[in-house]
Amino acid sequence: MWGPLIYALLGLAIVAAAFLFVRRSQAKEVVPVADDDDKENGAAADEVNPRQAGDQGHTDDEDGEEGNEGLKNFMYDENGKKLGVKKARKLQEKEERRRRNEEMAQAREQAKLLQHQEEEERKEREAEEAEDERQREAELEREREAQRQKELEEYNSLKSMFVVEESGELDVDHEAQAQSLLNEFVSFIKEKKVVQLEDLAAHFGLKTQDTIERIQQLEAEGRLTGLTDDRGKYIFISEEELSEVVKFIERRGRITIAELMDNSNRLISLSETDVEFPGDEPAPADVDETTTA
């Protein structure tokens, strides 16, 4: 009973084996055989991108992510293994942060250097200004000291000219007293207008030569203006009279000394004013000795 069934199965197996043999033979005829040019092109392609050809750890999912991101250049680790897109992006962002931090650190350092330089320049300017100010103050102090010394010398010169008739010198205890005496000397000349130098010297207890020197010094200081004639009289000229003389010369243009002298009596008062010397006793009045019965 099993005999016919066994023969049938064997027949089917033979038919299947023959079918597979025919299919394999057809597949060999379809696959082209690579020629020498194709082999050279394949070898060149392997040399151009050996990492991509030998990269077996790269998955299809990572290839899809790289294609979606549009990355043109792949990143590799220190072992030459190609990195995934996510990891490569993280490394790239980390590198960018590091570069930005370095740039910011350099900018801060440059700002600190610039600030330090500006601070040093400011200190130098302040030191120069302080030195200039110190020199100006020192110069002003020297000028003030020179002025004080000059005034002291003038005062001592004034004081030395006044003498007392009895002892030959005046003991001045205070500057105010000497200044008061000097003012009295100037005022008397101005009020007297024309004064005999000998009388002036005798009244103030001075020598005639000291009186002349004192008047010359006062003229140099601008406190007196006048002239001394050949009779030993000093004629004080006021500012108003000087102004009149200047106007006269300007009106006349060129003028000779003779013309000026001829008009001096009109321009300058030469009359002596009746002013009593301080401390002088008034002259006794004339007494009529005639008596009436």
UniProtKB/Swiss-Prot annotation:
<dbReference type="InterPro" id="IPR050899">
    <property type="entry name" value="DDRGK_domain-containing"/>
</dbReference>
<keyword id="KW-0472">Membrane</keyword>
<dbReference type="GO" id="GO:0005789">
    <property type="term" value="C:endoplasmic reticulum membrane"/>
</dbReference>
<keyword id="KW-1133">Transmembrane helix</keyword>
<dbReference type="Pfam" id="PF09756">
    <property type="entry name" value="DDRGK"/>
</dbReference>
<protein>
    <recommendedName>
        <fullName>DDRGK domain-containing protein 1</fullName>
    </recommendedName>
</protein>
<keyword id="KW-0833">Ubl conjugation pathway</keyword>
<feature type="topological domain" description="Lumenal">
    <location>
        <begin position="1"/>
        <end position="6"/>
    </location>
</feature>
<dbReference type="InterPro" id="IPR036388">
    <property type="entry name" value="WH-like_DNA-bd_sf"/>
</dbReference>
<feature type="region of interest" description="Disordered">
    <location>
        <begin position="30"/>
        <end position="151"/>
    </location>
</feature>
<keyword id="KW-0256">Endoplasmic reticulum</keyword>
<feature type="compositionally biased region" description="Basic and acidic residues">
    <location>
        <begin position="90"/>
        <end position="126"/>
    </location>
</feature>
<feature type="region of interest" description="Disordered">
    <location>
        <begin position="273"/>
        <end position="293"/>
    </location>
</feature>
<feature type="compositionally biased region" description="Basic and acidic residues">
    <location>
        <begin position="133"/>
        <end position="151"/>
    </location>
</feature>
<dbReference type="InterPro" id="IPR019153">
    <property type="entry name" value="DDRGK_dom-contain"/>
</dbReference>
<dbReference type="InterPro" id="IPR036390">
    <property type="entry name" value="WH_DNA-bd_sf"/>
</dbReference>
<dbReference type="GO" id="GO:0044389">
    <property type="term" value="F:ubiquitin-like protein ligase binding"/>
</dbReference>
<keyword id="KW-0812">Transmembrane</keyword>
<feature type="topological domain" description="Cytoplasmic">
    <location>
        <begin position="28"/>
        <end position="293"/>
    </location>
</feature>
<comment type="function">
    <text>Substrate adapter for ufmylation, the covalent attachment of the ubiquitin-like modifier UFM1 to substrate proteins.</text>
</comment>
<comment type="similarity">
    <text>Belongs to the DDRGK1 family.</text>
</comment>
<feature type="transmembrane region" description="Helical">
    <location>
        <begin position="7"/>
        <end position="27"/>
    </location>
</feature>
